Amino acid sequence: MMVYIMNAFDIKSTKMDVLSISLHTSDLFDLEDVLVKLGKKFQESGVVPFVLDVQEFDYPESLDLAALVSLFSRHGMQILGLKHSNERWAAVAMKYHLLFCLSHSENVKELGQVEVQKTEDGQKARKTVLITSPVRTGQQVYAEDGDLIVTGAVSQGAELIADGNMHIYAPMRGRALAGAKGDTSARIFIHSMQAELVSVAGIYRNFEQDLPDHLHKQPVQILLQDNRLVISAIGSE
């Protein structure tokens, strides 16, 4: 793996094993009872970080997230992020300074997720996640085991992650990471290249200065060649 070294710090890819807890009730008293019973186990491990899966709740208003964060914290558990198949939860996560993980479920048609049919040899094809709204500063979208298509503008400080390819049909000012699980054949296609950072299969490049005119704010594709990131104008020879 290559690491791009900057003056003050290094950027490199990493993977962490983090618990995912699926929430089945919004009743704080019921949750308190369970956490009290499990309290000793968690206290022995120190602070336990985890992602809270809120897929069973359709609307953010159905949960008192501030109370949930406080409740889990009192019992030695720290919520790192929220997981849901509806991107409206991203704004809620950002409000509480949490990460947002876009999950997959059978009822995410409003997000435009496409379950691709099996290929002729019976292998399951990649899924595609479509995001049509802007991705704002502090938000993170992750297309797990599939490709990501974004048609809304991506703000500086926002992050897009896909295990497969990435297509961004709008100005891209945030971070784009394709091939997140190591797929070196993944590519990134950007309609208007203004990204802070791009990565394919863990190989990064950040942009402290604007690219040359034939690439800056122009349609580009980004791919790996000989373990190096190559950025080229779409349509160029």
Swiss-Prot record:
Gene Ontology biological-process annotations: cell morphogenesis; division septum assembly; regulation of cell division; regulation of cell septum assembly
Source organism: Neisseria gonorrhoeae (strain ATCC 700825 / FA 1090)
Pfam families linked to this entry: MinC_C (PF03775), MinC_N (PF05209)
Sequence similarity: Belongs to the MinC family.
Known function: Cell division inhibitor that blocks the formation of polar Z ring septums. Rapidly oscillates between the poles of the cell to destabilize FtsZ filaments that have formed before they mature into polar Z rings. Prevents FtsZ polymerization.
Complexes and interactors: Interacts with MinD and FtsZ.
Keyword set, alphabetical order: Cell cycle, Cell division, Septation
InterPro entries given in the database record: CAP/MinC_C, MinC, MinC_C_sf, MinC_N, Septum_form_inhib_MinC_C
Signal sequence interval, chain numbering: none
Record's protein name: Probable septum site-determining protein MinC
